[in-house]
Amino acid sequence: MGISSIIIILFIIVLLKKLIKKEDRIHRINKNIPGPKSKLLVGNLFDLKGQVHEKLKEWYEQYGSVYRIEFGSVSTVVLTEYATLKEAFVDNGEIFQSRFQRKSRTTCNKGLNLANSNGEYFNHLKKTLSNEITNQKMKKNEKIIKIQVGLLSEFFNEISGGGGGGSGGSGISKEPINNIIKMYSLNVMLSLLFNIHFPYNNNSYQDELMSTITRYFKSTGLPYPSDFIPILYPFLKNKPKEYFEDYESVKKLITRITNEYQLKHMTEISNKSTIEEIENYQPTNILESLLKQYRLNKIPYDGVIGCLMDLILAGSDTTGNTCLFSLVALVNNSNIQEKLFNEISNAFNDDDGDELNGANDISNSLLKLSYFSDRIKTPYLVAFIKEVKRYYPCAPLSVPHLLTEDCEIQGYKIAKGTQVIQNIYSTHLSQSFCSNPLEFSPERFLDSTNEPKIITFGIGQRKCPGENIFEIEIYIFLVYLIKKFKFSHPIDDNLQLNDRGQFGLSLQCPQLNIKVESR
């Protein structure tokens, strides 16, 4: 045996001893938390294939609101129910704030993006983005969203018989509309960031781009063995191959667009020579604000690209899937769809000159619509959106956290170093959250004094700063399209569309074909 082999073996032994010593403390503290039995080395990883959120719901119903599972060698605690999540992530927010760092993710983003970064760097990123996504600034940007809804409505108009695309005017979409709907939310983010957008058609490049984003979001939510079984990392560090290829593909596109934007729109800041001059530069959008911080050496360029990828990927996939599930809910609950149509028709009646009457009216009728001032006119629609977010939670498990100090939650002591998961999916579908949780009922949100508290992307100090963009996009999307179109099952009005979401970082809507009729 050569000296190099001996050194490697000794290194592995020392590493394993350190790992066992560290894990012994965490396991010793966490062992009193109930949970399923785990297997040697792999823990419960083999149980977490496919519909992970449904398995965690099954365990919640068996073990309660605080339970323990093993991701390989990583002790993990799953928290469910609003009171439990609030106790952890709000009442003890500081020690639950950090993200659990997974090598597969940091290999791609270097831990420099908003979703995965920690500490002061994360706080600086969040402040930079939050300052650019205030309600006041979003009021000025509502027009961008309304223009995209108007363009999307042209696609639906073609399906319904008003044009030559989509379905040839038959009323039924020839292909699933998932990528087109996600293109709407992608275009909103591209317009907000770069002042560009893609057309709404089944172009092969656009289809591949949206399919890549969907694939990435489905895979990035899954637990990879290489992240949790250290001894396997050297052999599996580039697996699954598709995940890394999808990330690099989207990163290349966003980097190119960002570089082009700088050359075209930011010659002023690019030529600044002093810190004071850069400090005095007034950004006009989120991208310029991030690039300003880069010029001030407060964010590396990889951090700029990482944050843009968070906004674009998460913005298109979470919002897009929520819009898709909204359409599914309209089709599967035709009585609710009619209630919404009547409410919207009365709120935006023709006598006021506010008739939402087609893409050609973007300059007048649609541009008068405002999320900020018009929500009060549509309480049932607001309740419907909340119920969609409850019934089809867009981030079923959010992004895992890391506990940085020992803490007691609901009577159970949890060890420092534990991975912690927010079980949003099970929370929204639990009896503790609302009565009859498996029934789709917007009425539960009409009583504002006693309504359940929705968790959209997560709870606590890592709450997504872009949540208001998400809310505006969905509201305007639904007001305009419900007023213009009737949506139904493509084969038989008495049939139900499949609404079982597929697990991913965001809950994926099944492939959706739909019948569209003009109102």
Curated annotation (Swiss-Prot):
Task: List the subcellular locations.
Answer: Membrane
Which GO molecular function entries does the Swiss-Prot or TrEMBL record give?
Answer: heme binding; iron ion binding; monooxygenase activity; oxidoreductase activity, acting on paired donors, with incorporation or reduction of molecular oxygen
Record keywords: Iron included?
yes
Summarize where heme binds, as residue positions.
C464
Uppermost EC category: oxidoreductase
- Protein name, UniProt field: Probable cytochrome P450 513D1
Q: Which domain of life is it from?
A: Eukaryota
Q: Which InterPro entries match?
A: Cyt_P450, Cyt_P450_CS, Cyt_P450_E_grp-I, Cyt_P450_sf
Q: Pfam families annotated for this entry?
A: p450 (PF00067)
Q: What organism, scientifically named, is this protein from? A: Dictyostelium discoideum
Enzyme Commission designation: 1.14.-.-
Listed A to Z, the keywords are: Heme, Iron, Membrane, Metal-binding, Monooxygenase, Oxidoreductase, Transmembrane, Transmembrane helix
Task: Respond yes or no to whether keyword Cell membrane is given for this record.
Answer: no
List the transmembrane segments: 1-21
Q: State a GO cellular component annotated for this protein.
A: membrane
Membrane topology per the entry is:
Single-pass membrane protein
Q: Which cofactor does it need?
A: heme
According to its UniProt record, which protein family does this protein belong to? Belongs to the cytochrome P450 family.
